[in-house]
């Protein structure tokens, strides 16, 4: 996790989930997402990147069974009054990227990402 001074209370979460479907071995869903999240922090450190906001890596469990891990994280985050500017997850395997999606209220995008 990187905690910085300019906006330390604004969290950008990157993550993946450790569990997989019972018939799968988990390399693509979502072992590759776990590696993507951890490698992002490693690269940020290697190039001495200094983010303006806190960057937190979270590896969830029990996502394939109703997203219980991320719901537990959200409950704890809400109880601690944390503000997450964005949450980024890679969950489509380690193949060539097919695109980038964003979910949320589009009216808040300029407010959240305009800084």
In which residue ranges do the predicted regions lie?
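Short, small-residue-rich loop/turn micro-motifs
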Residues: 4, 15-18, 91-92
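Metal-dependent peptidase/peptidase-like ectodomains
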Residues: 9, 22, 60-115
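Alpha-helical metal-binding/catalytic segments enriched in His/Glu/Asp
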Residues: 10, 14-67
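Short beta-strand-to-loop junctions in surface cap/lid or active-site-entrance loops
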Residues: 1-7
